[in-house]
Amino acid sequence: MQTHEIRKRFLDHFVKAGHTEVPSASVILDDPNLLFVNAGMVQFVPYFLGARTPPYPTATSIQKCIRTPDIDEVGITTRHNTFFQMAGNFSFGDYFKREAIELAWTLLTGSVEQGGYGLDPERIWTTVYFDDDEAVRLWQEIAGLPAERIQRRGMEDNYWSMGIPGPCGPSSEIYYDRGEEFGVGGGPIANEDRYVELWNLVFMQSERGEGTSKTDFEILGPLPRKNIDTGMGVERVAFVLQGVHNVYETDLLRPVIDAVAARAPRPYDAGNHDDDVRYRIIADHSRTAAILIGDGVTPGNDGRGYVLRRLLRRVIRSARLLDIEGPIVGDLMATVRDAMGPSYPELVTDFDRIARIAVAEETAFNRTLAAGSKLFDEVASTTKATGAKSISGSDAFTLHDTYGFPIELTLEMASEAGLQVDEVGFRELMAEQRRRAKADAAARKHAHADLTAYRELVDAGPTEFTGFDELSSEARILGIFVDGKRVPVVTHGGDGADRVELVLDRTPLYAESGGQIADEGTISGTGAGESARAAVTDVQKIAKTLWVHRVNVESGEFVEGDTVIAAVDPQWRRGATQGHSGTHMVHAALRQVLGPNAVQAGSLNRPGYLRFDFNWQGPLTEEQRTQIEEVTNQAVQADFEVHTFTEQLEKAKAMGAIALFGESYPEQVRVVEIGGPFSLELCGGTHVHNSAQIGPVTILGESSVGSGVRRVEAYVGLDSFRHLAKERALMAGLASSLKVPSEEVPARVANLVERLRAAEKELERMRLASARAAAGNAAAGAERIGNVRVVAQRMSGGMTAADLRSLVGDIRGKLGSDPAVVALIAEGEGGSVPYAVAANPAAQDLGIRANDLVKQLAAPVDGRGGGKADLAQGSGKDPAGIDAALDAVRSEIAAIARVG
């Protein structure tokens, strides 16, 4: 039975049983703690947690899943895969154990004619949680399984929870006995190679509390609504039904192996273990890479992008080790498309983009391999010669830092060479590099101050931020610093009064973070110190908890312990909130137009302006850009309420709140919700109260800021109005100058540009015609030096090196077969001095070579040049030396001609 038929029968079975068919989610979700979707139930987590009401009581899906912790084991064994398909059925308070067991049993053992898989009931075993007597009874009643084929296991194997407080419950796993040839009997407990797990049924019936491990937590009581979550491994069912030994022999991966075998000089499964491992790595990783790129991941240096890069690099290197010559990744992507396209149409419709990204990574990595492999070979050879067994951490670091070798590649190559790698030393050097980078960044931020000076205040506790609720707060000065040194008092006009840092116990001034730049404002004295006033120019965080206000003392004095009033410039804050809320709106619009794969990669917002970086391959079309701007402004005009609240991290994620991947978050997070479902993000910044306060959003442009990362820039609010007014005035000026209505300006400009280009072409044609006429005259007036005909001339201005190279060839052809040399030089644009020399075969026979003569031209004009004996060229910088250069050529020819 082909895999696409296995999938179809699964979905048909559950749809007939009243389930709603739900498409697979993307393998990437907005969850900072989840690298990839790795289970079928992930997209349903909000329903299981009760954070959202499910739109259907039961559902079925076949989810794309990726697991990469065991990536190094892929290929070495046939059990590990980085991509797999999890077929599942789910009940949200509808049916429970009996129905779940009945549905699974009838599909597995039902006849092929009736839509089942036709598995032999006598070869099916199950495991249950050790005290789940109900499950044992149901298996006996429904399936007639004898007691010896129902094995009890503990929490480690047969009890499920998410690892946090929430739903939990026992599970029952279904296994298939492959027969005696695969090992000893005794059921799954004895041998999981012979007994293959096909399906896991999870009975969510209880609520768990906090715990210390997977198996150590408190059961708080029964759930008000019991749920079902099941997962059947499509690939495992496929290799059982197709009668093969493992997933690599199924119709999903065997075509990739066959495609590799067609290019490799050595076949698969011919008794060479290392080669077989390489075949399997290529097959597995190619499939996973295609799925990842299809879901919007692009190769990068961290997170999901790094996983993709590592997978592709392992494919490329495995192909090299199989002695496959030339590029192969494009062919592999096509094979994956053909094998999996029926199940995943995006692999077909988006194939050009998928192949382009994969091939670009192959090209780049081949350059890395070429550069670094030579050094690795030298390092490995030296290591062995000294009798050492391990490549030093320093050498591994050099390979990484200089040649871009990831440590995993160095480990892999070292293992093949019979060596180990000092990973500890490597990690220490990497950590030191990161420490230096952080120290440099901190030093730049804090004017190279000694940050240990703030340690006492950091240890005393965090600064209280009051700026969400008020723009002015009474506070106490906890510390005063000048140039990083703590001082008791600072006075206007005193030394360092413009370089002061004040630490307060509380403040309404926002410290730069989360892409939002710091507030501006004032800190003023009270009471006897009323005359003291300082302008706040920046606010930074130290150790994430201590707000440091950089100020310029404008009057009076500040003393540690004084009570002061810290106030935000309200106009600045208004602009900052417009920029930050505008960023959220643009992010939501991007995802609405481009899809969930447009993942945030960074942002900057300040009053009136926002900048948003996101993961995306290739530039946006004009239509996409216009649509993003329109969706954003429609949401702004909708006057959505902006609602902020704190929530448990897991609950917020279950609600669908977007988080930055790779960021660490506390257990309690702040959520910013704009317009209900329109935008929901984890965010600690300041925002408007409703979307209409943002004002218009004008996208200025979109550009690339790195491989797979695009940037959108926009004005918001009054700055957007000003920009539009400026553009309107510019258009009016153009219309006036061109004497056409504004709406006709683009067509008029296009017409003028076309006419200008035509005129430029005609001028170029006339210039070249004039130059060729001059060439004919030059040939006719050639001088003789000895028995050599020589044309050595200064040409008219504006000539390029290409012009001169063409002309010397033309003139040389007109001088006949006698020894002849042509040397032309001109004063080009921008003070450049291009020149070219040609020597015919007869002149070369006398020892006169163009590449020698070009050096004579070069010296007087401060230039350089090179070429071959028949043709050479160059360029200089000093037009004053042109005549001397031509004289030098004539002298050189005369000297050689006399010798000849």
Swiss-Prot record:
PROSITE patterns: AA_TRNA_LIGASE_II_ALA. GO terms for cellular component: cytosol. InterPro entries: aa-tRNA-synth_II/BPL/LPL (IPR045864), Ala-tRNA-lgiase_IIc (IPR002318), Ala-tRNA-ligase_IIc_anticod-bd (IPR018162), Ala-tRNA-synth_IIc_core (IPR018165), Ala-tRNA-synth_IIc_N (IPR018164), Ala-tRNA_ligase (IPR050058), Ala_tRNA_ligase_euk/bac (IPR023033), DHHA1_dom (IPR003156). GO terms for molecular function: alanine-tRNA ligase activity; aminoacyl-tRNA deacylase activity; ATP binding; tRNA binding; zinc ion binding. Pfam families: DHHA1, tRNA-synt_2c, tRNA_SAD. Its EC number is 6.1.1.7. Its main location: cytoplasm. Binds 1 zinc ion per subunit. Zn(2+) binds at H580, H584, C683, H687. Gene3D superfamilies: 2.40.30.130, 3.10.310.40, 3.30.54.20, 6.10.250.550, Bira Bifunctional Protein, Domain 2, Threonyl-trna Synthetase, Chain A, domain 2. SMART domains: tRNA_SAD. Keywords: Aminoacyl-tRNA synthetase, ATP-binding, Cytoplasm, Ligase, Metal-binding, Nucleotide-binding, Protein biosynthesis, RNA-binding, tRNA-binding, Zinc. Its cofactor is Zn(2+). GO terms for biological process: alanyl-tRNA aminoacylation. Coiled coil: none annotated. CDD domains: AlaRS_core. It is an enzyme of class 6 (ligase). NCBIfam families: alaS. Belongs to the class-II aminoacyl-tRNA synthetase family. Consists of three domains; the N-terminal catalytic domain, the editing domain and the C-terminal C-Ala domain. The editing domain removes incorrectly charged amino acids, while the C-Ala domain, along with tRNA(Ala), serves as a bridge to cooperatively bring together the editing and aminoacylation centers thus stimulating deacylation of misacylated tRNAs. Catalyzes the attachment of alanine to tRNA(Ala) in a two-step reaction: alanine is first activated by ATP to form Ala-AMP and then transferred to the acceptor end of tRNA(Ala). Also edits incorrectly charged Ser-tRNA(Ala) and Gly-tRNA(Ala) via its editing domain. This is Alanine--tRNA ligase. It comes from Mycolicibacterium paratuberculosis (strain ATCC BAA-968 / K-10) (Mycobacterium paratuberculosis). The lineage of its organism: Bacteria, Bacillati, Actinomycetota, Actinomycetes, Mycobacteriales.
